[in-house]
């Protein structure tokens, strides 16, 4: 006879406790414990231990590596983030804010897979078949039929998968699924963890790629215990400003590929469109000849990404000047402002400073330091930086400009987009092999950058 009891779970890491705790001893999170009913087996509760059958260990040399190739999703930006395509038997978690486009992205992927004659089942626990059909019609005609299932009972879903043996399964969303063996409601910590565990075992045993949609909390992490992210093979976050048209797909965990790649999409009336050249997309509509506007180049994995850095420096009306940073680290901006005040003598203590990465981008790469400094100098001196100039480099506390990685790829991207001048760290100059078509200027310190912005040349 199964015996019911209650256990407290930490919502952050999944730590179990017989009583409520104010602070989790594992992850140190405060007020994170919730009470969940669980089912204990009678034999385990009574202390009776059954004899388990021993498993035979296998020598690694006798295991043949899988010859199965990755299956392309049909969406090149999606394939880039996954590491080249879908790995059979993988469990992929796709998280993001409500309404950001997770279901739309996976429905478009389903359409592309069906066109490749890939057996796919789309399981929805949030929408009816009629609602999914309306969304599918908006995305465009499906050349091949897509198998749909509106179900939240995980036992029924598992039996359906075993019966039809698809190659790819999409679960939308994991918070709506429930197991009958767990007495708590759908979306609870124990239900989400158990459902993910069942799907993981199913994916490995049947060699089926399973995508699960997970909603995020107000802190921006997937709802449910943090152990959920440790159970899956890949964790993708679909993010972006809901008021902007572009979306970014990032991998924060990937057992089968890099976590440094991003996929860029644009939300349009027909769904999500791939952005093949994100640099050109980010710089569209940039004003020319305006003080405080500078183009920088950041690296997202192996892809150079050009973006506009904006700065507004003006006289303050408060005793303590305001400092705001949108899209980059606030403390880093304060550090750079202090460097300018100390090394160049700029009177920034009496000025408000507002820093913004145009388009709602969020970056913390040190390589955009020099562009932030250039934008601040440009706004402070009211001297516009030429629109065909691109700047990148890391700035140290002594005002020196340090080398950054992949400098040649950044310069090559600037040349491809028609930029004529590129200001880079002096220590990176020796690694730039091709300078045809673009003028590359080495910057040793912030004084060199100040001279370039004010006079157009750098002192020897």
Segments and roles (model prediction):
Residues 2-12, 16-80, 87-95, 100-107, ...:
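Peripheral, non-AAA+ core regions of ATP-driven protein-machinery
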Residues 125-131:
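Conserved Walker A/P-loop ATP-binding site and its immediately adjacent core
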